[in-house]
Amino acid sequence: MNSVTTNKMTNYRWVICAMLFLATTVNYMDRQVLSLTWKDFIAVDFHWNDNDYGTITAIFSLFYAFISLFAGRFIDWMGTKKGYIWAIVVWSLGACLHAGCGWVTMYVENIGSIEELRNIAAGSQAAIAVSTLSVWLFLACRIVLAVGESGNFPAAIKVTAEYFPKKDRALATSIFNAGASVGALAAPLTIPVLAEHMGWEMSFIIIGGIGFIWAGLWLFLYDKPSNSKFVNEAELAYISQDEGEAAAEKEETKANEPTLSFLQCFAYRQTWAFIVGKLMTDGVWWFYLFWAPAYFSELGYPSSSGMGQALIFVLYLIVTILSIYGGYLPKLFVEKLGQNPYAGRMRAMLIFAFFPLFAMFAQPLAHISPWIPCIIIGLAGAGHQAWSANLYSTIGDMFPKSAIATITGIGTMFGGLCSFAINKGSGMLFTYADGLGDAFSFFGQTGKPAGYMIVFCYCAVAYLIGWVIMKALVPKYKPIVLE
């Protein structure tokens, strides 16, 4: 029951949007702790190589993809409030558990001190045992993290559909989706400092603990718009302005589960269009997220150095500033040109798909200055974030509210498969290329730089290919109509 009685429209929907932004920021900071500590801290202790790290990130992506199949259904069944709390508590717990991997490894291998651990001869049986055990322990923690984190975007997209009319959803999604960039932006300024001064273990514990605070705030602040004491009638009317909104709300209230079964979702071309958009492009962002610190370290600027932190910070600053405009362009097409939301989003996504093409020039120009690949990857990442925000919003354009989280989970699963392939493939490729040295070449690059060149080329063209396939599957606006 709404308790706000003023005639002036409240703007509580933006408070909720801010909470989604904070959750996504925490989500990505938890995910970034490993990428910012493995090369300079953890690998030194546990004798990891690129392939070991690639395995950990790939398995995380695989489980993230698999659990995403059920995360959307879980959010639909549990409800947004409880479901979101469960998700963030689980992933925060998983983040904190990473801190114990070193202690368990030392205990099992009967190693008495950090100095003894680091002084183990590289390539020895003891080093292999330490590396293998620690990788398995980190994998277990990453799986717990993946289980919780897989619920973030299905829940956030469902909340956006509940609190925003269709014309504003891309903007709201752009704002909370920018939390990914802000989380990645804040991470290099905080995590290496924590790891340097307090140990890499405390960086996992401190960053992971923030999620528990968010869960307490969500418990107090969130309720459905029609039940929220902070939303007045004017704002509720604005939220429900779309045709058929009221009827959909009533049907959703009556329903105990999505009106589309899991298998029925795959019968629609709209589902496959969303799947293709995620399958082609999600792994690109995850590659930038997981490998950018290691890439700059290869250029001679580790994340523990001031220059390394500056490069990563500026990269994600570019992403953050530019990606926030991802929701404005389709809104302009809808309001100024009179296009339907889907057509406006697809036109905007085509424009955003050209930004990642810059990635092809990151490696060839890296010898001039590290700032060149920094700026290029930032532009490509901004294009991804703008693309992703609009891609998520196409679900609300096409599907009934009750199925939004399920469709989001399906798409996220396929996006996770792309991330698995890119991260595992990258780790194997970089280790292989590094071993061959000058004997491995691609487009004028040799050794490990040639490996990076190969991955950057895929990152560059993935969006245009994905857009063409999506357009072929759903050429015109066609929402799902259930009989």
Report the location of each language-model feature.
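Extracytoplasmic gate region of multi-pass secondary transporters
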Residues: 34-36, 265-324, 384-388, 392, ...
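C-terminal ends and interior cores of transmembrane alpha-helices
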Residues: 89-131, 350-367
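C-terminal transmembrane helical hairpin of 12-TM major facilitator-type secondary transporters
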Residues: 342-390
